[in-house]
């Protein structure tokens, strides 16, 4: 009975061992597949582990299938059932395997014959359990297998002895693989948990950082608001540039340190929203505040910190000068010609500058009044007494004003080319002393009077700079400008462009040289023929004569609080006869007048720039002057050295055919002039 139990145990072991081995392989394959599905989103490390386990299982499956060729589909079905129990009762399977090991050790002394019989019984038992077709097939080959088994009895006995050790090794490997797989799963799960915790911590840090930044921005805003008006725009510009960068750096601290956090959609969206909201709020506030401060473009106190010059530069053109919006198409840009835009270049290099738009043919007085309203803004008032004296209308065009807050203490730089130099001198005289005739007229007749004519507006001009200005008049106007035919020609041009369809404006509308809306052109021509303009001295042609300039010099004086400076050019050379002849590079239209001035009776007047004599451009005869040095002075004309080979328009770059005067030279000249104006503010500033 005891022997019978041992045989039964061996047979049971053989069947069970095979079933367990196959079940274990299936379990490992199924477990690996399940683990692979669960870890599909966790990276390539888990995939490579699953693939490695699958490859090992395939090798073990091929080895065991060779040893168990007689085990077929039904055993597989049974093994699947056992696999489910093994999946749920792993400790029991280990105990059972240990019992089988002990039982196998007790049967090591069995003979080869008994082992063969047991193998035959093993085959027969399995044959009885098979379907009918499989049993017939097994019986057919029973005798053949019996002979094979007898011939390999010794080898089979050794195989039986070694099977327990192989099973032990296989089970141990499978167990180690399972533990390793579970360990990796736990490790990956731990990493995921740590990653989520880190993300949560980062979000918490981001929220704290953003709150601190918002507090700092609010504090900075309050501090800037408390500062004086002169520092407002600059402070807000600095905050708007620095604060968004500060938010960008702190609002996303985990970008470089923890790249895996980018895969967390919730964390990424949260950080993105935090960053965008923080930056947008800072920029929006700073932009609105700066926009409010810069809304009034004529408020110098809100703009001056943006420029190198505290006092704006006003460029004033000469006779027959225009701005681009009202000039004839045949004329080039006044300030810079085809070489450059002087005003724009000054702006780009940090200087606040404007181009004045005043009458092209008007007198210095009328042009000075227009210049005042161009800067200050408002409707031009030529004065009741002045209009009645010369026979033109009292009111002219309306200007918007480029510097509405212009008043004593808020100064400007006046730069005049040609006749523009006379005009700015006239304006400064009106600001300081007004017009006594207008004051008396207003007392007698009542009505309104412009503040310009009341005087008492000192400390409104920082400097006066003239370029090729005929301070003492010019022979060109004496000999040609006031000839009847020349005057008629000039005014006919103005009359022609005065039609209602023309955009050209010569600044003679207050003289009636502008066609009315309901007036035909024939009616317009007949009306202007009776204008007093043709014989009036209230015109530019008269003021450019030596008599007209002398009259202006008598009415004007030097202001001790203003820096005066003149720039002069010449473009003629002396002949054997002692006269001056125009150079080859002189602007072609000026060769006639240049040669005419070069033949003047007064030798000191002969050297000229084509329109103005050098002696007339340097300074008014009746006013004090000195040679200019690196150190500026107030209350005296500072005469700069004469620029040789510079004709009348080279100062403003209008001669595009002149190869000697380059754009770089012109730009360098104006940059030096602007820098000198800034230096003069140290002498004239009222904020010392």
Curated annotation (Swiss-Prot):
Region described as Disordered: 31-309
Lineage: Bacteria, Bacillati, Bacillota, Bacilli, Bacillales
Domain of life according to the entry: Bacteria
Leader sequence segment: 1-35
Binding site for Ca(2+): 647, 650, 655, 658
Entry keyword annotation includes Transmembrane: no
UniProt-annotated location(s): Secreted
Record's compositionally biased regions (Low complexity): 68-79
Species name: Staphylococcus epidermidis (strain ATCC 12228 / FDA PCI 1200)
Biased composition (Polar residues): 45-54, 144-172, 184-211, 274-289
Keyword tags: Calcium, Hydrolase, Lipid degradation, Lipid metabolism, Metal-binding, Secreted, Signal, Zymogen
GO cellular component: extracellular region
GO molecular function, one term: triacylglycerol lipase activity
E.C. number: 3.1.1.3
Main location: secreted
Protein name per UniProt: Lipase
Catalytic activity: a triacylglycerol + H2O = a diacylglycerol + a fatty acid + H(+)
Family: Belongs to the AB hydrolase superfamily. Lipase family.
Biased composition (Basic and acidic residues): 84-95, 103-143, 173-183, 240-267
Record: active site: 418 (nucleophile), 609 (charge relay system), 648 (charge relay system)
NCBIfam families named among the record's database cross-references: lipase_YSIRK_Sa, YSIRK_signal
Propiece span(s): 36-302
PROSITE patterns listed in its UniProt record: LIPASE_SER
Disulfide bridge positions per record: none
């Amino acid at each position: 009975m005891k022997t019978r139990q041992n045989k039964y145990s061996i047979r049971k072991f053989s069947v069970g061992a095979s079933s367990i081995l196959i079940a274990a392989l299936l379990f490992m394959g199924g477990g690996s597949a399940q683990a692979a599905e669960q870890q599909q989103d966790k990276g390539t490390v888990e995939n490579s582990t699953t693939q490695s386990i699958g490859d090992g299982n395939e090798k073990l499956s091929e080895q065991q299938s060779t040893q168990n060729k007689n085990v077929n589909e039904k055993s597989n079905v049974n093994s699947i059932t056992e696999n489910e129990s093994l999946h749920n009762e792993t400790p029991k399977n280990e105990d059972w395997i240990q019992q089988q090991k002990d039982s196998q050790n007790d049967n090591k002394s069995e003979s080869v014959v008994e082992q063969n019989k047991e193998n035959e019984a093993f085959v027969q038992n399995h044959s009885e359990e098979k379907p009918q077709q499989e049993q017939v097939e097994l019986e057919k080959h029973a005798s053949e297998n019996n002979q094979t088994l007898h011939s390999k009895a010794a080898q089979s006995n050794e195989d039986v002895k070694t099977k327990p050790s192989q099973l032990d090794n296989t089970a141990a490997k499978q167990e180690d693989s399972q533990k390793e797989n579970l360990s990796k799963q736990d490790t990956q799960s731990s990493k995921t948990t740590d990653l989520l915790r880190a993300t949560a911590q980062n979000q918490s840090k981001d929220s704290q950082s953003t709150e601190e930044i918002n507090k700092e921005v609010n504090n900075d805003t309050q501090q800037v608001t408390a500062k004086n008006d002169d520092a407002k725009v600059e402070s807000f510009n600095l905050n708007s540039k620095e604060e968004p960068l500060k938010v960008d750096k702190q609002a996303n601290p985990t970008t470089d340190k923890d790249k895996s956090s980018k895969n967390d959609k919730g964390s990424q969206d949260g950080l993105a929203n935090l960053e965008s909201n923080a930056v947008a709020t800072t920029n929006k506030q700073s932009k609105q505040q700066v926009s409010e401060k810069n809304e009034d473009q004529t408020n110098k106190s809100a703009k001056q910190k943006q420029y190198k010059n505290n006092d704006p530069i006003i460029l004033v053109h000469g006779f027959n000068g225009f701005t681009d919006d009202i000039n004839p198409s045949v004329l080039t840009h006044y300030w810079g010609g085809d070489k450059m835009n002087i005003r724009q270049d000054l702006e780009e290099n940090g200087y606040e500058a404007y181009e004045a738009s005043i009458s092209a043919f008007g007198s210095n007085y009328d042009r000075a009044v227009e210049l005042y309203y161009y800067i200050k803004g408002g409707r031009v008032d030529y004065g009741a007494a002045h209009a009645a004296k010369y026979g033109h209308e009292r009111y002219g065009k309306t200007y918007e004003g480029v510097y509405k807050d212009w008043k004593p203490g808020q100064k400007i730089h006046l730069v005049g080319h040609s006749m523009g130099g006379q005009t700015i001198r006239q304006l400064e005289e009106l600001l300081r002393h007004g017009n006594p005739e207008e004051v008396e007229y207003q007392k007698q007749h009542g009505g309104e009077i412009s503040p310009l004519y009341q005087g008492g507006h000192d400390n409104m001009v920082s400097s006066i700079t003239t370029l090729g200005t005929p301070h003492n008049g010019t022979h060109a106007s004496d000999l040609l400008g006031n000839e009847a035919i020349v005057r008629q020609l000039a005014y006919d041009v103005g009359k022609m462009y005065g039609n209602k369809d023309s955009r050209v404006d010569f600044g003679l509308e207050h003289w009636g040289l502008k066609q009315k809306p309901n007036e035909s052109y024939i009616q317009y021509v007949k009306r202007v023929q009776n204008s007093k303009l043709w014989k009036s001295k209230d015109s530019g042609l008269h003021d450019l004569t030596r008599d007209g300039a002398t009259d202006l010099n008598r009415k004007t004086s030097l202001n001790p609080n203003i820096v005066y400076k003149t720039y002069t050019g010449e473009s003629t050379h002396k002949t054997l006869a002692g006269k001056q002849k125009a150079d080859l590079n002189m602007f072609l239209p000026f060769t006639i007048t240049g040669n005419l001035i070069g033949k003047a009776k007064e030798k000191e007047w002969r050297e000229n720039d084509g329109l103005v004599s050098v002696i007339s451009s340097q300074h008014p005869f009746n006013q004090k002057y000195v040679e200019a040095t690196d150190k500026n002075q107030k209350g005296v004309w500072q005469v700069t050295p004469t620029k040789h080979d510079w004709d009348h328009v080279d100062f403003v770059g209008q001669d595009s055919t002149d190869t000697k005067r380059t754009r770089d030279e012109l730009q360098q000249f104006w940059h030096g002039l602007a820098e000198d104006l800034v230096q003069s503010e140290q002498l004239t500033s009222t904020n010392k």
